[in-house]
Amino acid sequence: MERAMEQLNRLTRSLRRARTVELPDDNETAVYTLMPMVMADQHRSVSELLSNSKFDVNYAFGRVKRSLLHIAANCGSVECLVLLLKKGANPNYQDISGCTPLHLAARNGQKKCMSKLLEYSADVNICNNEGLTAIHWLAVNGRTELLHDLVQHVSNVDVEDAMGQTALHVACQNGHKTTVQCLLDSGADINRPNVSGATPLYFACSHGQRDTAQILLMRGAKYLPDKNGITPLDLCVQGGYGETCEVLIQYHPRLFQTIIQMTQNEDLRENMLRQVLEHLSQQSESQYLKILTSLAEVATTNGHKLLSLSSNYEAQMKSLLRIVRIFCHVFRIGPSSPSNGNDMGYNGNKTPRSQVFKVRKVYDVVRKIDVKEMNFTKHAFINQTSHEQEPLELLWHSLDEWLVLIATELMKNKRDSANITSILLKQKGPDHQDATPTPSFAAAGTESRKELSTDTGDSKTYEVAGKQEAYADCQDVISMTANRLSAVIQAFYMCCSCQMPQGMTSPRFIEFVCKHDDVLKCFVNRNPKIIFDHFHFLLECPELMSRFMHIIKAQPFKDRCEWFYEHLHSGQPDSDMVHRPVNENDILLVHRDSIFRSSCEVVSKANCAKLKQGIAVRFHGEEGMGQGVVREWFDILSSEIVNPDYALFTQSADGTTFQPNSNSSVNPDHLNYFRFAGQILGLALNHRQLVNIYFTRSFYKHILGIPVNYQDVASIDPEYAKNLQWILDNDISDLGLELTFSVETDVFGAMEEVPLKPGGASILVTQENKAEYVQLVTELRMTRAIQPQINAFLQGFHMFIPPSLIQLFDEYELELLLSGMPEIDVNDWLKNTEYTSGYERGDQVIQWFWDVVEELTQEERVLLLQFVTGSSRVPHGGFAHIMGGSGLQNFTIAAVPYTANLLPTSSTCINMLKLPEYPSKEILKDRLLVALHCGSYGYTMA
């Protein structure tokens, strides 16, 4: 009966308290009953359960083997913690990681729990398995108030963890100012190194903790490297921590020059150096000028080393350009930058920055250059005793002297080569003059010198030998100096450009290029890759482009494509992320049933800069995303742009290309749509997406800014083009045509007379002015009639593709960039080819020709097709459907008598290749490739 009553009472208490009132007998089960109560600090319930139980309060459970005292300390359950301590819980019991309850209380900032644990003799010096004590945990988390209480019980405030780090190390690394001050006040060793030799200052700088670094330096911390020689400044620069660098320089001024010298270290990231110097330059005008002056001096030193032929070209070139890039960056962000309207000329003196580079020194430099027994020596005297000289001006002066010297030698040897030729011809005698080619002095070498020097003893022979040797030496010097000088020229261009507002070219640099035009062209002709390595200004400056465009366009198409995309993306925030995924808010959401209009609307509202970096499209109601969807979007828009319903483009006479519609104004939104069409093609080119659309040659010329000519008229009116050709080919003086400089044009059914020039209706076309008439009427048909459409298209296109970059290509190459390389079926080509003027299918030359075509690359086959037909495409249906000037016209090969060095030519209006009767397959292939790559339309000799 008594037992039953006791069970009933336990049941009643349990139901009232909604918990058990008696712990299980085994510790494992009991501890999981108590743990949630301890976590909630339900000390009365815990006390009641423990009072009638044999539970071991030090029982360790779980994966990390912690006791309930660990749980209470970790959660801040101070009442339960005290209860457990009174019940005999061990305050120094360590879990599997070596942590005591005091460690956990310190880590989580449980102040009351820490106090009670200390009352019950918790050992503050116990380390966990990683060597961390309670004060380490307080320092990591910046719990200064608790640290004040704890350090009174600590015997060694510099106790180290497994890596030799003290509490001061970790407090400095995490930027806890008051904690650092507390530890220092408590006697922490301010210069104590860890196992790798890193001091607290080193730790502060490693994470850019400016304030803790300043406290340490104020308290006398030493500037010490670690065991690997890495200094606190190294860490600051590596992380781009400008503010911390500023503090280091404040206490150690010598470090300023160390930072400047770091600009030569290619192992340091350039953008981090820029960040540091940018911050330092913003502190004061004097600091800004000091940085620029120092950078200019280092750049000058590196530039002169680069001009020294004994230095390592690759290393010195990279160092110079790196320093100059950093210099220009700092220069631009100054308080009186060009964008703010201030004159930044090197030679000016209106702004403080005109004094940036000036240093008061007396220079007396004598430079002597003697290369491979050269017959000339350069003495450059720079005497400055009465005025200040800008450091960089010394480098530019040396550059100028080098270029003048080379120009002089080139001119001298050019005269000598003419004299040598004359002497050689006289020695050979009149019977040999016709058979003796002019010597190629670019290839003059040792053998030619030996031949000349071992002649009969004629004094003229030795004269020739000496001059040839001098010429060869000059060529050696150019070979050794061209790249070095080109790198310095690039540096000069960068410095000139940083003084100018965006988009403007420095007049000083233009003058420099004009002055040294011959030498620069010599460099480019000898090594065309210089254009892409150092002579970027040729493409970035419209004023200079025309002078070198023929050289630029002579470079391989592949090289120009690589340069194009490299510079197209170079101005973006992160050129490595051009094709990165875009933000959800930047996705172009379009409707399939109105894809043209909806795409036009969303693209016009989108951020152009973001579209350049990445593009994503989603069709309304569909989940698909990714490059496949983008590809489909461009494909569909390619067809929609030339959809007759929009009246934007009309099909040309060849049936495969399109031309802007001069009557597109029937669509009220036609100019908006033309701008959108330009945006789509610009976007496609930017992201290397091909479009399935082809335009007339004249339209590609409009995109490139190339003037059209009368031959372009054939794409829209072949018969009229033939008439223009006839006028040019024949004397019209006595024909009585009575043409004037005006034409009649059908404007929506009404005939209007349009003057080709002011007063054109009263100016007769004559034999003398007929060429002008043909050009003006061509411009009317091909340009003036569609000028608004062209302008709108280019406005959209240039949002994504700068005009200066696209001019790298001709109209044929632009088509390849936009629409890709067409596939050419050689068998179909052969089957639909005709032969004339003496050739037949079985002739040896014809067999060689087709063997060569089989050996050509796909790109070269396209060039051949363009060369003969004027088009890179095969029409739908194959070669049987190729159009000529008067309709269908098969590819035709005509025989031409062979003479030495004769190139193939073509007549594109009748798709005819005029192929000389070459004596061998090798000569045929060589001459054909020369013609294709040199574009010998109308040429007859190599």
From Swiss-Prot:
GO BP annotations listed: Golgi organization; membrane fusion; protein K48-linked ubiquitination; protein ubiquitination; regulation of cell migration; ubiquitin-dependent protein catabolic process
Record CDD domains: HECTc
Catalytic activity, reaction form: S-ubiquitinyl-[E2 ubiquitin-conjugating enzyme]-L-cysteine + [acceptor protein]-L-lysine = [E2 ubiquitin-conjugating enzyme]-L-cysteine + N(6)-ubiquitinyl-[acceptor protein]-L-lysine
Cellular localisation: Golgi apparatus, Golgi stack membrane; Cytoplasm; Endoplasmic reticulum
Enzyme Commission no: 2.3.2.26
GO molecular function, one term: ubiquitin protein ligase activity
The UniProt record lists the keyword Acetylation: no
Domain HECT stretches: 607-942
Sorted UniProt keywords: ANK repeat, Cell cycle, Cytoplasm, Endoplasmic reticulum, Golgi apparatus, Membrane, Repeat, Transferase, Ubl conjugation pathway
InterPro entries, per the entry: Ankyrin_rpt (IPR002110), Ankyrin_rpt-contain_sf (IPR036770), E3_ubiq-protein_ligase (IPR050409), HECT_dom (IPR000569), Hect_E3_ubiquitin_ligase (IPR035983)
Pfam family name, one: Ank_5
Biased composition (Basic and acidic residues): 447-459
Signal peptide as annotated in the record: none
Cellular component GO terms held in the UniProt record: cytoplasm; endoplasmic reticulum; Golgi cisterna membrane; Golgi membrane; nucleus
Function description: E3 ubiquitin-protein ligase involved in Golgi membrane fusion and regulation of small GTPases. Acts as a regulator of Golgi membrane dynamics during the cell cycle: recruited to Golgi membrane by Rab proteins and regulates postmitotic Golgi membrane fusion. Acts by mediating ubiquitination during mitotic Golgi disassembly, ubiquitination serving as a signal for Golgi reassembly later, after cell division.
Name recorded for this polypeptide: E3 ubiquitin-protein ligase HACE1
Source organism phylogeny: Eukaryota, Metazoa, Chordata, Craniata, Vertebrata
